[in-house]
Amino acid sequence: MGTVSVLYRERKAKFHTVLLDADQTLFDFNKSQRLSLKAALQKNGYPWNEEMNALYSKENLMVWKKFERGEITKERLKIERFENFFYKLGYKNADIAAVNADYIFHLSQCGFTIDDADTLCRALHGVCKLYIATNGIQSVQERRLEKSNIKPYIDGMFISDVLGCQKPAKEYFAFIFHTLQIADKSGVIILGDSLTSDMQG
C-alpha cells in the first residue's frame, strides 16, 4: 500500500475516479477469515487450528476462482467451499449450512482494514471519487464497511450480487461506467490485488 500511496500522491490529479477492490486491497481478509472460520467451527463443535485455516483458505480461493470464471453461482460457492473443506478433513456429516451461516455472520462483523488503507482513502477523499468494486457477498461487504474506519471516505460500492455479473467481466465495468456517467475512462484507475479477478475486464 505504501507504493500505491506514493503513486497517488504524484498522479492523483490525473484521475477523477478510483475503483478499489475490497479484500486485501482495503480490508484485511486474511485476518477476518481466520477469526470467522475459528468462531464458526467452534460454535458448531468442530476443532480449529492453523492447518485447518490454511486448508480452508486454499479451498475457498479455488471455489472463488470458479465463480469468477462463471462456472458456479454465488449460492453454490458458499456450500462447495465447505463441502471440499470437510471432505478433506474426513467429516462425512458436517452441518455445512450452519457452519456457512455462522461464518458469513462473523465475517460481516470484521471491519479490519489493511495497513495504511485509511491513510490512502483519506488522502484521496475530495480529490477523487472512491468506489469499492467487489465480487464479495453483499451482506458481508455492506456490514463490514459500516464497521470500518474507511466508510467516511467511500462514495459508493458496486457488488456483483446486485449487478448480476461479476469481475472481471466487461459487463461489470460497463455497468459501473454507465451508472457513474463516465465517458472518459482514462480518468479511472482500478486498484486491486489480482489482475485476473480485478482488472482483466
What does each of the following model-derived ranges do?
Residues 98-101, 106-112, 117-148, 154-160, ...:
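Substrate-recognition element of Asp-dependent hydrolases with the DxDx(T/V) motif
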Residues 34-38, 148-150, 176:
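Glycine-rich, phosphate-binding/catalytic loops in enzymes
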Residues 94-95, 152-156, 184-188:
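Short acidic capping loops at alpha-helix termini that bridge into adjacent secondary structure
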Residues 14-16, 128-129, 186-187:
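Short coil/turn segments at beta-strand junctions that form active-site/ligand-binding loops
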Residues 8-22, 26-115:
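N-terminal helical cap/lid subdomain that shapes the substrate entry/recognition surface
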